[in-house]
Amino acid sequence: MKESLLTLTEKIMFTTTVLKPTITTPITMLITTMRTLVAMKIRHYWKMMAIKDRKIQIPPVKYQMELSIRTLEINLLKNVKETEANLLKRRTDRENKRHYEFGFFYNLRIHNIYIPTSFFFFNSIV
């Protein structure tokens, strides 16, 4: 049990740090870990039931756990999407502010294209 948990943790660390360091990856790995742990618990429960009754019974606990994990998964992914959207908005606002402060571009955007100040300047001369 301890070895499998350790291996799982190492996989999570490797995946989150080396392979894809995004916001979504750690949460996906967390969900995978939880699913694995729940599966281990269910297997253990089945073994105990088999030893006790000499037959395997499908526990109602399994369905409750699956349902709660699915709900948690949906909530986590929803939070991730909101966080990513907020980060993107914040970065865009910061870029707008920086361009406006340094005077390279007007703080005016048409379809996400910055219009340089020189365009207006030369247009007014001609």
Curated annotation (Swiss-Prot):
It comes from the Eukaryota. Partially overlaps SSH4. This is Putative uncharacterized protein YKL123W. It comes from Saccharomyces cerevisiae (strain ATCC 204508 / S288c) (Baker's yeast).
